[in-house]
Amino acid sequence: MRTGVIAKKVGMTRLFQEDGRHVPVTVLSLENCQVVSVRTAERDGYVALQLGAGEAKQKNVAKPQREHFAKAEVPLKMEVAEFRVADDALLDVGSTIAASHFVPGQYVDITGQTQGKGFQGAMKRWGFGGMRATHGVSISHRAHGSTGNRQDPGRVFKNKKMAGHMGDRQRTQQNLEVVRTDDERGLIFVKGSVPGSKNAWLLVRDAVKVSRHAEAPYPAGLKQAANSNDSAAADTPAEVAAVEATEGQEG
């Protein structure tokens, strides 16, 4: 079992397939998603990875959390979450997970906080059909109908569908297809809609009801650190121009 990731919902758009069909997708962004801590069976009683994502200001982070991030030698994180993993899927603290952790064609489960709608009536909240506009209906056009009957049972049953607060609940959408990934920009394109509003933090995991994709990297798809020697060896355009000018003067 691999780790999931913490992603930010950017918004929705569409992608065109090779045959011309367009697919509505949700764009998810990985903002420096790093391993902050490791949970082991010997010390904690279970095996998991604690990940952090985003960049928080120091004034918005409590001192114990600042010490926690400093111990891991990672920047201050805006969002932190734990993912249960297998023993052979543990990662080093400080490892950065890339968008290549997921591959096109695989299915994922996405957990988020749905958009809050405030206090809503029974028709909008539960999809009730309502009553007729005229012909025998008085002030009950959008009412939910019977609530507690009469003397028997003389009470309102639990979970009765009535008007009340709608939305702002944690929900998980299962078996969403990954259409495309952009490793350079850290973007994941998922088919369809996902819970939450724009800029909301989401938890993205491998689908539990579908086998893991054969091409999905195990234990994780990590972002490779840039090699300083390679970058130093590469000539900049200014250096190339200077060499060419020098060669012209020698001639």
Swiss-Prot record:
GO terms for cellular component: cytosolic large ribosomal subunit. Transmembrane segments: none annotated. Keywords: Methylation, Ribonucleoprotein, Ribosomal protein, RNA-binding, rRNA-binding. The keyword Methyltransferase does not apply. Residues 221-251 are annotated as: Disordered. GO terms for molecular function: rRNA binding; structural constituent of ribosome. The modification N5-methylglutamine is found at Q151. InterPro entries: Ribosomal_uL3, Ribosomal_uL3_bac/org-type, Ribosomal_uL3_CS, Transl_B-barrel_sf. Methylated by PrmB. Residues 225-251 have a biased composition (Low complexity). It comes from the Bacteria. Belongs to the universal ribosomal protein uL3 family. Part of the 50S ribosomal subunit. Forms a cluster with proteins L14 and L19. HAMAP family: Ribosomal_uL3_B (MF_01325_B). NCBIfam families: L3_bact. This is Large ribosomal subunit protein uL3. The gene is rplC.
